[in-house]
UniProtKB/Swiss-Prot annotation:
It comes from Acinetobacter baumannii (strain ATCC 17978 / DSM 105126 / CIP 53.77 / LMG 1025 / NCDC KC755 / 5377). Pathway: Amino-acid biosynthesis; L-arginine biosynthesis; L-arginine from L-ornithine and carbamoyl phosphate: step 1/3. SUPFAM superfamilies: Aspartate/ornithine carbamoyltransferase. It catalyses: carbamoyl phosphate + L-ornithine = L-citrulline + phosphate + H(+). This is Ornithine carbamoyltransferase. GO terms for biological process: arginine biosynthetic process via ornithine; citrulline biosynthetic process; L-arginine biosynthetic process.
Amino acid sequence: MALRHFLTLRDLSTLELNRILERASELKKMQQSNKVYQPFVGKVLGMIFEKSSTRTRISFEAGINQFGGSAIFLSPRDTQLGRGEPIEDSARVISSMLDIVMIRTFGHDIVERFASYSKVPVINGLTDDHHPCQLLADLQTYIEHRGSIEGKTVAWIGDGNNMCNSYIEAAHMMGFKLKIASPKGYEPKPEFLAEFGHCVELFDNAEDAAVNADLIVTDVWASMGQEEEQKLREKAFADFQVNEKLMGLAHPDCLFMHCLPAHRGEEISETMLDHKNAVVWDEAENRLHAQKALMEFLLNENLKKA
């Protein structure tokens, strides 16, 4: 049996994805009832960060500790993948001392190359092309609040970025319709649209995408590494803010999500996080539970392989 990794959502079957989402909610209930569950005592998670993140570090480190294991944090100062030592060599050495690895970096090819030479499961904590761990949390959150997302309509408002790409994959796997509203020049990459055009519809304005949506999602206008484009992007995205008026075009029980951190007054209105249908705090917490379910799945799959 081949070693299992989680670099994109499609590294799972739809059945496996649904099982992980169900398990995430089970683990959440166990945590809330103070039940101690430590199946991975002695297991070590390596966390390689070339892009910093508060939520990613806390959720993974807390998760493996709650499982009875431990985590090692490697900052850009500690390891520079592909700079000084080939990624392939780093992967062989690092994975020989760990049980599972999470990488948060820039180029998606970095996690692919690392996984190709790793002896243990590798999780994509975020790359420029994909953010699959966030989709696990988003899907779990929607299901907990509204039930199945199959057949629903999701509106993505803003940049056709890594989050948007992962939503495109999720639409294909989970059977929902995805309406994407982006300014000209900021649409998702053509290769993602070409493969999943059957479940995606593009719009050049936020209002049309929001009509009758069951879920509205957005992200920052300028991601890490795009700071020099901030002013240009503010101008391009000015008409793509998620606010109370836009929510009024959606289905009455439409949920609102944002992966955080959010910039009030930019991609969202000053009060959007306090909207009655905003579930961003549950969404943020569910990073912990969804990633615990993912780690449990990958570690158990690796044990089967052994």
